[in-house]
């Protein structure tokens, strides 16, 4: 095996660095659960873990190193093309089909290599195995595999990581309607987090409990940079359409998009400054005070 990469990033540094303020080397950081501003963080020291992509995180293995190399290829493309894509979108210019597919692959890759997807996959796999083995004697095998080995198998993270490379997920994104939010506001910019791409159930789909949480129906939100947000929505009658919306002077729209990151990220949010974070903390504090009166 070639030289190992021990510190493996879940969110690429090339993405985090684009959210740095001018002449700044660290990002403002919000602890989402505690709604507390933490000390500023360097992109090189966050959103990563020792042998994170190994099948058993923390332990070196060949799978984790191969995943790291594959992610590196994607990140190299991102670093080389991000500026051009951002400029096009700010100028309300549609991407070519090739550019849109490549960016869609990146978006789905970011989503399915994330903390939340891994946690959800591990939880679902264990829950499913619990249901299969419920009431079985310990010596009963499952397709010739002992129950002990079966539980060891579902603890592997590769089942979650592998989905980050599925072409079909990227292809599905290209067929959605893309709303591009353009934000040139110098004070309130788009934020990012330990989940560079988030997804959520759109309001219209909440009445479809069987389908609302499917990847196709859910809305994917990607803050490409402090200036550009991409909202990929399921709208069958508007498949593949583009809509460019300038939100520079619409602070409520900027806050709405940022709040989605607060609500659907893993643990931490990051930005070039703490303007939005402080505004959010003040709002929640005021709300609590009103509720107690």
Q: What residue spans do the PLM features occupy?
A:
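Alpha-helical structural context detector biased toward long hydrophobic helices
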Residues: 1-7, 11-293
